[in-house]
């Protein structure tokens, strides 16, 4: 699985952008759907830029809950690992008067799914890296995740570290000042959020989109990116 560029037009003369197909739950109109086994396509959006954001981090760091809060402004407690390996949806936002479509991929944190999740890095325009402020191990693993990102997505992809579950301050084991020093040393921004209390979630997505926007170079009209087998 990987990314490649295609310049071949469709029968209508318009290029199309293929969506991830392997064990992926897709959502064209922000509605839930089942696994897709056949490729799905979407005509390239002309008026909006499409930024692909990948959510990564250890299992149970709250990636899915943050995505649900951003998507539907709802909070769902996930007690069990999701059967979905990659969950995808698109949401439109506006940055400095510019319309942006954020295509967000929530990757499974389970080790057994890492190979599939990693294949999406190469197509990422930006990455959110999660840890749980009440779980020291998830923060200790941030360095390993960063190494993986730099190896697979390249050294220049914008990254935002997400210190999640800040509503659990009484259970905090990761001091934010220490985490910020770690992030500052690597020149990576960091933000605390809470999906439960709806704190900082939308701000985080806008912040990362703004970083992407600084160096964004859209594909030519006759060129598309494909993610798939």
UniProtKB/Swiss-Prot annotation:
One Pfam entry name: Ras
GO cellular component: membrane
Residues linked to a lipid group, N-myristoyl glycine type: 2
Database matches in PROSITE patterns: RAB
Biological process annotations from GO: exocytosis
Span of the annotated motif Effector region: 79-88
Alphabetized GO MF terms: GTP binding; GTPase activity
Record keywords, A-Z: GTP-binding, Lipoprotein, Myristate, Nucleotide-binding, Palmitate
PTM annotation, UniProt: Although this sequence lacks the C-terminal cysteine motifs subject to isoprenylation in other Rab proteins, it does have N-terminal myristoylation and S-palmitoylation sequence motifs.
Sequence ranges of Basic and acidic residues compositional bias: 15-32
Gene3D superfamilies registered for this protein in UniProt: P-loop containing nucleotide triphosphate hydrolases
Region (Disordered): 1-39
Binding site for GTP: 57-64, 106-110, 164-167
Lipid attachment, kind S-palmitoyl cysteine: 3
Family to which this protein belongs: Belongs to the small GTPase superfamily. Rab family.
PANTHER family tied to this protein: DRAB11-RELATED
Name by which UniProt lists this protein: Ras-related protein RabZ
Source species of the chain: Dictyostelium discoideum
Gene: rabZ
């Amino acid at each position: 699985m990987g990314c490649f560029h295609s310049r071949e037009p469709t029968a209508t003369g318009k290029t199309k952008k293929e969506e991830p197909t392997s064990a992926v739950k897709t959502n064209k109109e922000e509605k839930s759907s089942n696994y897709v086994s056949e490729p799905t396509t979407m005509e390239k959006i002309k008026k909006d830029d499409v930024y692909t954001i990948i959510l990564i981090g250890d299992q149970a760091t709250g990636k899915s809950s943050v995505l649900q809060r951003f998507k539907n402004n709802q909070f769902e407690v996930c007690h069990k690992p999701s059967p979905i390996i990659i969950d995808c949806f698109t949401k439109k936002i506006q940055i400095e008067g510019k319309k942006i479509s954020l295509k967000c991929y929530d990757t499974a944190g389970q080790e057994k799914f890492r190979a599939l999740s990693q294949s999406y890095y190469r197509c990422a325009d930006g990455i959110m890296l999660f840890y749980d402020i009440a779980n020291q191990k998830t923060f200790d693993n941030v360095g390993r995740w960063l190494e993986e990102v730099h190896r697979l997505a390249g050294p220049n992809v914008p990254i935002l570290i997400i210190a999640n579950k800040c509503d659990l301050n009484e259970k905090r084991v990761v001091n934010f000042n220490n985490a910020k020093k770690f992030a500052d040393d690597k020149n990576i921004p960091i933000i605390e959020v809470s999906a439960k209390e709806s704190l900082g979630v939308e701000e985080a997505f806008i912040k990362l989109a703004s970083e992407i926007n600084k160096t964004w170079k859209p594909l030519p009209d006759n060129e598309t990116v494909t993610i798939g087998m």
